[in-house]
Every structure is written in C-alpha cells, then in structure tokens.
Amino acid sequence: MPLLARLAAALRAPAPPADAPTREEPRRPARPNAPDGAANHVVVVLDSCRFDSFVRAKPRFMSRLGEVQRRWTYATWTAPSHYNLLIGLLPHESPRNVYASDYYKQDFLRFKERLNFDVSFADMVPNLWLPGYLRSVGYRTGMYVSMPVLNPATPINRDFDDYALMDRHNDIVPMIRRMRFYEERPSFYVLNTGETHYPDATPDEPENHWPRISGVNGVFKHLDDHLRAGRAVHAREAEAFFDGERLAQLHARQVNAVQWVDRAFEELLDTVPPNTWVTVTADHGECFGEGGYFGHGPIQHDKVLEVPFVEGRVR
C-alpha cells in the first residue's frame, strides 16, 4: 500500500463504540468577539514550488493579488517551514544592511494590514503561535494539508478548529470547498497543496502517466509510495537516471502544475467573502539538477530557498 494510503488509513481509524468512555478535553476559555473589522486570512502554500516555475507559469488569477515577489524560505523542508509560517514568519526578503531583529519587527507589523486590526504580538508570548493567538482574539482557524509529514497527529495541529490531511495529495479544490466563513467572526486558513510537489501531477492526470524513476537512493526512491520525504541525491548516483532533457521535463511538469492550481484559484477568489486577505507562497523550492542536487531538504542551494510570494486583499 502506498505511503499516503497507509498514513491516511492510520489517521482515519473507525469511530469508537457509542458506549466507549470519552476523554475529557481540556477546557478552553470562551472565545471573545473578534475586533471590529477583523479580516479573514487565507494562506495558500504551494508545496515545493520554485520561484522561477511560478514566474514561467504566468498565473493569471494568483497574480491579481499583487506584485509577485521572489522571497526566501526559512527552511528547506516542509515541516520546519510550516512551523515558521505558523509563528508568523512568512518567507523573507533577505534584506541587506538591516538587523534581523528590525526585519522581524517590520514583518510582524504587516499582519496589521493583513488582519485589519491592531495586532498585539506581545500577546503571542510565550506561545509564539499564530493560530492560538488568532483563536484568543475571536477567529475560527483551519488547516488542510496534502503532505503526510503535516498529518493531524503531528505537533503542527495545535489550536485549529478544523485540521485535515486530504484524501488526495494533489488537489486544492476540495480544500477550497471545505473552507467556511462566518458573519459573526473572521476565519484563518492555511492550505498546503501538493500539485507542485514531485511528481508534479495534477488531479486530471491519470496516475499511470506519472513519472516513475526507481533505483535511486534519495528523493526519487520509493516512488511507489509517491510522497516520501525528500532527500538529496548525489550527482554520481543520479547521472544514469537524469539527463538534461529529463530534468527539463520534470521542471516543466511543475510549471504546468502551477497553471492548474491557478485555474482552480479562480474558485477560491469567488469563495472568499469581502474583507479577506490572501497570501500565496511556497514552503521551499526544488532542485532539478542544479549544482548536482535533486529534490529538497538537506540541500543548500538558491533554487531550494527561492520561493514565490504574492498577497493582497480580495474585494
């Protein structure tokens, strides 16, 4: 059974019998009313999407949000990158001649524009956890993920009203349709979508058309499991499996995946209510042979660190 299917089965265990004792959940304080005018915020994370792939795709709908920027991720792998995002550290601009502490402060202040109220990051101490803070000021929170390393049993699933590992790793549409927005309080959502993660397959592509490359110790090993965590592949090991044409094809698949997500993104723009701020970015990039690297993770290379970033208020 593929890795994703095994994890999904384990995480979707049958419900206990009706007479089974229930575990008492810790009491949460009553959720207050949100600040007046507080905005909904939706963060879309295109897993493994390179900045240049995004630019080559020329996304029509995502680009409506604002200027497409090249930014830099704080981490080269999915789990730590999402942790950074959830403490409020979105991909950075790599500014020169600026103290890091000053940049953090300026970057956090951007949340006042995104959320449309006077955000107090002093209130995030000591938890340093954006979903928890937003719940404490009246938000509903949700996160839908494609990657098994972010499954609901992991520590990332904290302070969310709705958190789910989706049935398919490469389809943002069910995430969009699962989101709920309310008149009485704003919502915060994170959507981790995997169309742009290897094998860069869109939902309309038959699985037997996906690329199959076996026998390599690294990111493209275990492709029957499809979505194992990325590992570096040394150029000597990969030489027999990857030539320039093959790598170009793999990169082109990611560009095509961005275009597919962009078409689906039109539905997201139609779904969210007025006063919603949407951010689109990636958790990390991907190497397609540059510098002798393949994949992401334990790789120090610009193409793994460069990510797209675009955001803005909808209507």
Please tell me what each predicted stretch does.
Residues 1-315:
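Catalytic domains that recognize anionic headgroups
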